[in-house]
């Protein structure tokens, strides 16, 4: 069974959001999560899940 790593990427997520010119509410709507969850992610109070990382990549066409 593979061990999962916990990944915190708050500052990078915040920088990406700002570079895209998005508010937390807009990004949350795009990713189908709550704005408060975006805020928690950006403050490193929640880890970035693999599912959410994939949604970010698909939604914003990232490699």
Task: Go through each PLM region and give its residues.
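A short, Lys/Arg-rich alpha-helix, primarily the initiator
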Residues: 1-20
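Short polybasic/polar patches that bind polyanions
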Residues: 14, 18, 29, 58
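DNA major-groove recognition helix of helix-turn-helix/homeodomain DNA-binding modules
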Residues: 51-63
């Amino acid at each position: 069974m593979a061990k999962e790593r916990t990944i915190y990427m708050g500052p990078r997520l915040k920088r990406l959001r700002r570079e895209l010119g998005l508010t937390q509410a807009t990004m949350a709507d795009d990713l189908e999560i709550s704005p408060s969850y975006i805020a928690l992610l950006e403050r490193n109070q929640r880890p970035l899940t693999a599912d959410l990382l994939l949604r970010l990549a698909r939604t914003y066409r990232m490699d």
